[in-house]
């Protein structure tokens, strides 16, 4: 009698799992997409704060150029990959005032902070103006 009780409990438990697992699988992509969107928002916000504090003095508050190139330019943003932008921030540009910001190169930014900056710059892309001579910055134009 007690064996049949355990078998019944086991079968009911298995039936619950069989029903619950597909329901969880249906919901999982939505949860993952929500988490990704939330992380993207947070990266954009933090990247914007990092940019304002560390980059705006040379590149302008909205990335519209200064003594450094215009980063909020359609030409720059469409011509470079995320990895290229990250490498420019990490290692700097030899022979220019753009110093290295990555920890491995003596800078102060972690890889995550660099990714946050890249995410912020990418958030400017949909409304980026066309600036054919974006490399010059404002002082050279």
Q: Model-derived features: where do they sit?
A:
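Sec/Tat-exported extracytoplasmic proteins
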Residues: 54-55, 59-62, 92-93, 121-128
